[in-house]
Amino acid sequence: MSIASVASVFKGDFAVGSQVTVRGWVRTRRDSKAGISFLAVYDGSCFDPIQGVVPNSLDNYNDEILRLTAGCSVVMTGELVESPGKGQAFEMQVTKVEVTGWVEDPDTYPMAAKRHSIEHLRELAHLRPRTNIIGAVARVRNCLSHAIHNFYNEEGFIWVSTPLITASDCEGAGEMFRVSTLDLENLPRTDDGKVDFSEDFFGKESFLTVSGQLNGETYACALSKIYTFGPTFRAENSNTSRHLAEFWMVEPEVAFADLNDVAGLAERMLKYCFRAVLNERRDDLEFFAQRVDKTVIERLESFVNSDFAQVDYTDAIEILKSCGKKFEFDVEWGIDLQSEHERYLAEEHFKAPVVVKNYPKDIKAFYMRLNEDGKTVAAMDVLAPGIGEIIGGAQREERLDVLDTRLDEMGLSKEDYWWYRDLRRYGTVPHSGFGLGFERLVSYVTGVSNIRDVIPFPRAPKSANF
């Protein structure tokens, strides 16, 4: 007898007639007048449950089988047979059911077999993985995570684990979570009354990282091609469907690469990931197409078969100004493109993924390479139909004098970035990279529009439960 996952049964890993044991949770129980119960049991390994046909001849049929409700955990053993019913290839003729865990009160069980709003499920983050939608999101998220690591491994990149605690603000925006062990009731003070952070754990102000990029650059300038993949934090008080306080970022960094090189890398990576999901998680995608967004499969297939368009920011502004469409946010050179502008470019003008390049320097970070015109930097955004910006990247400023000028312009301390400046003093090299918000990628693939529903335990303003 073999212990089998439901996914392995449906993949045909076990021959018809095999004795198998499946361990999981009851999704539904249906009783027939002929003295047979049908148990739908899932274990999370794939979207569909497996049906167990349970005869009333089992010793515990009356005492236990007929009491099973959604959420009860069971170990079910029986013979694998071809299913005469529609919708599944196999089912089990059950010879034994062991109940390992009961639902205490089925009438008040929050995950009873009925449809719940996604907003309601957010309040039950510890139980929502048991639902179809969150289980499917988790499997797609896992698939995408593996695809990212596989892609970079095949491309010859080295994964680098950058620190979560840092003293530098990569974005220069100041929206950072402070890390401190100081006694808030008895803060040490300097002579001028300010908090004395020299008494703190690290001897200085420290924060949760907003990006692994700056640390990643140090390794790219020694190992040539690296990537980071880990959590990042933004203390941005935005209570929207697009923002989280804690989220995951994928950040490759490539030495001897310019902006066009990493634009090509971004295109290859996204297509690799989408092909992986289309090949490996078709069952979950079909659910999303049926219940969430009917265009998800078509959108991904179109994406992998499209060539990316490219346009300069200045030309994109002219396209938006002359298109005749009324936007909520006015369009003029120097603005940061809003979601409505990005989606118009990708969905209506180019009708394809598009890379917008060479943004005004005043709306971009200090580390982006200044172009010859002195007004723009070698920055890019990858815009995807259906969501807008999905990747942001840039060629890094490798010239020390220009970098110092940019730090001064933005009021940032050169002393704080002494180690980052050292990279430009010792064998400087052109290098480029980008950042991909992983949750935004999962949202795009699944069609689940609120980013709080594509991460297991969302962290947002006034929300850090579980």
From Swiss-Prot:
EC number in record: 6.1.1.22
Pfam family for this entry, one: tRNA_anti-codon
SUPFAM superfamilies (alphabetical): Class II aaRS and biotin synthetases (SSF55681), Nucleic acid-binding proteins (SSF50249)
One of the record's GO cellular component terms: cytoplasm
Catalysis performed (reactions): tRNA(Asn) + L-asparagine + ATP = L-asparaginyl-tRNA(Asn) + AMP + diphosphate + H(+)
Classification via PROSITE patterns: AA_TRNA_LIGASE_II
One Gene Ontology MF term: asparagine-tRNA ligase activity
UniProt key word Protein biosynthesis: yes
Compartments in which it is found: Cytoplasm
Keywords, comma-separated and alphabetical: Aminoacyl-tRNA synthetase, ATP-binding, Cytoplasm, Ligase, Nucleotide-binding, Protein biosynthesis
Domain of life where this protein originates: Bacteria
Leading EC class: ligase
Biological processes, Gene Ontology terms: asparaginyl-tRNA aminoacylation
InterPro entries: Aa-tRNA-synt_II, aa-tRNA-synth_II, aa-tRNA-synth_II/BPL/LPL, Asn-tRNA-ligase, Asp/Asn-tRNA-synth_IIb, NA-bd_OB-fold, NA-bd_OB_tRNA
Similarity-based family: Belongs to the class-II aminoacyl-tRNA synthetase family.
Entries under PANTHER family matching the protein: ASPARAGINE--TRNA LIGASE, MITOCHONDRIAL-RELATED, ASPARTYL/LYSYL-TRNA SYNTHETASE
Subunit structure and binding partners: Homodimer.
HAMAP family: Asn_tRNA_synth
Protein name: Asparagine--tRNA ligase
Source organism of this protein record: Shewanella loihica (strain ATCC BAA-1088 / PV-4)
